[in-house]
Each structure stands twice: as C-alpha cells, then as structure tokens.
UniProtKB/Swiss-Prot annotation:
Protein name (record): Cold shock-like protein CspD
Keywords (A to Z) from UniProt: Cytoplasm, DNA-binding
Main location: cytoplasm
GO function term, MF aspect, one: nucleic acid binding
UniProt keyword annotation of DNA-binding present: yes
GO cellular component: cytosol
Superkingdom to which the source organism belongs: Bacteria
Record flagged with keyword Amino-acid biosynthesis: no
Localization per record: Cytoplasm
A GO biological process held by the record: regulation of gene expression
A Pfam family this chain is assigned to: CSD
Length: 72
C-alpha cells in the first residue's frame, strides 16, 4: 500500500488525482474505489492509503482508504 496526498478531487465528476512520494506522475482516483461509509469523496490535501495499478492509460489508485487526521 502507498501513502499519498489528494491533489484535487471533483465531487460532481467523481474523480481526481493523488500524488505520492517515489511516483513521478499523478495517480488517477475514482470515487468507486474509495473505501468508506456514506458519501465517497476526497478533499484536496487529504492523506490517503491506496494501491496502484499501472496500465497503458497511466496509473490509477484502487482500494483508497482516507487516513484520519489525528492532529485535531
């Protein structure tokens, strides 16, 4: 599993991109692979854990799990 930060996520379209250390290109993120209860969405700057699949269309995230901010 990789750890990354959400660069941006469009709730209306249901997708966005994640950046991760050691990965040159941004990683595509789709709402359908976000693992959480309720409305599945991400916010820019949010820390997430995920797996990466590589295809001819680029890298995309699977099994995206938001990481709770424990600094509150």
């Amino acid at each position: 599993m990789e750890i990354g930060i959400v660069k941006w996520f469009n709730n209306a379209k249901g997708f966005g991109f994640i950046s991760a250390e050691g990965v040159d290109a941004d990683i595509f993120a789709h709402y359908s692979v976000i693992e959480m209860d309720g409305y599945r969405s991400l916010k820019a700057g949010q820390k997430v854990q995920f797996e990466v699949l590589h295809s001819d269309k680029g890298s995309h995230a699977t099994k995206i799990i938001p990481i709770a901010d424990t600094q509150e």
